[in-house]
């Protein structure tokens, strides 16, 4: 899980999701998991 000010899709499997007011990126590749913070 990477915590970043600006979350971006890193590949075509990445999806930007908003959960409880937190922007997250979910992906089939665990290295691509990100959250905004």
Curated annotation (Swiss-Prot):
Swiss-Prot/TrEMBL keywords: Ribonucleoprotein, Ribosomal protein
Any single biological process term in GO: translation
Pfam family, one: Ribosomal_L36
MF-aspect GO terms: structural constituent of ribosome
Family: Belongs to the bacterial ribosomal protein bL36 family.
Name recorded for this polypeptide: Large ribosomal subunit protein bL36A
Keyword Ribonucleoprotein appears in the UniProt entry: yes
GO CC annotations, alphabetized: cytoplasm; ribonucleoprotein complex; ribosome
Taxonomy, superkingdom: Bacteria
SUPFAM superfamilies, per the entry: Ribosomal protein L36
């Amino acid at each position: 899980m990477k915590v970043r000010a600006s979350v971006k899709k890193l590949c075509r499997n990445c999806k930007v999701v908003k959960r409880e007011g937190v922007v997250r990126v979910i992906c089939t590749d665990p290295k691509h998991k990100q959250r905004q913070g």
